[in-house]
């Protein structure tokens, strides 16, 4: 679960995570904070590793007391079929959590053939996290296909 105030920008290749592929966004990311009063600040390498990429960042000094969510988690799956014209669609499911409980959820749809989102999340941060998660998901999928 990534911090809901984290705005990921690019993959972080040297994050020193034991199992980077298991991180909430599919790998480690560098980026900026979007917490009120800290917009555009660049977290340290340690903050990225301990808070931003992991969510439930109660130890982070930037985390506002009043917030809608504590973390956001994602999952993806390929859906659709050729008969109804939805082949190549990927559903990215998100769950926003507060105090370890669901506080909002939904599904974002990506058309892999047209390389575009069918619908976008109302919150730019969640949308960007979904884009990063999808990028990591597709890279893992390509690697698995190449290995078989």
What are these regions (language model features)?
Residues 1-148:
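Cysteine-centered metal-binding/redox modules
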